Amino acid sequence: METDGRLKAYKFVAYAAVGFSIAAVASVLLTLPMVYSYVSHVRQQMHHEINFCKGSAKDIFAEVNYMKANAGPVPPRNRTTRQAYGGPEVNPAPNLQCEGCCLPGPPGPAGAPGKPGKPGRPGAPGTPGTPGKPPVAPCEPTTPPPCKPCPQGPPGPPGPPGAPGDPGEAGTPGRPGTDAAPGSPGPRGPPGPAGEAGAPGPAGEPGTPAISEPLTPGAPGEPGDSGPPGPPGPPGAPGNDGPPGPPGPKGAPGPDGPPGVDGQSGPPGPPGPAGTPGEKGICPKYCALDGGVFFEDGTRR
């Protein structure tokens, strides 16, 4: 009985261990792909964010360098004297226009909301709290005094018989017994194997000559067994060609051939559109009267 109980307990422990092992292996097989996919997703996201930060930094540096290159010295303001009323302007101020500068436009529309940030670091531990109030009740509960011991009761009924005990140890081997009386003879055994051939005996005396009689053929004997199969015959003539089979599958494309020879040059294209007219040139005119030089705008230099 005890051995059966132990065997059942051992079987239960073994099955439980195997079940827990299988559950652990299954959980590992299920969680590993999930962890790998999450790590790869986080890695790709970090890679995209790093690339975005690098691109933003490059754009900022490029804008700063562009502003440094285009920010030349400030030209001095040309403050001329006031014109006399009714008189011609002596030194007119040049018409300075800022072609390379532009005012910033209105702000663009608001962009899409960014991704939620990562959780912050845990805060510092708080200060210790104030001590609590003293307890009203005592810490250790008071136990009432024990009751007086009761008198001993009558003996109970006898219990059921116990289980049989374990088998005892093996006893020591006994002494060997005395030899028994010889038994009755057994049955006759099978004949033994044939003995070796004896030596040849002496040659006998020659017999009397036989009477000569004509030979008479005997009766025909029984037909003999069939002989072994003969050797294979010569190969036959080749048969006629069978019908053509179905077309085979399309083969893989072959390698690219060598480049072909250059073709002939095409005809000349149509003439392009007429260009914009050039700047008006300066053509001086000479005057023979006083030797001065006049230009088309009427000025003299």
Curated annotation (Swiss-Prot):
UniProt subcellular location: Secreted; Secreted, Extracellular space
Any one annotated GO CC term: cuticular extracellular matrix
Region (Furin-like endopeptidase recognition region): 79-82
Renumbered residue ranges of the record's region Disordered: 109-284
Region called Triple-helical region, residue ranges: 105-134, 153-179, 183-209, 218-283
UniProt xrefs under Pfam families: Col_cuticle_N, Collagen
Subunit and partners: Collagen polypeptide chains are complexed within the cuticle by disulfide bonds and other types of covalent cross-links.
Protein's recorded name: Cuticle collagen 1
Species assigned in the record: Caenorhabditis elegans
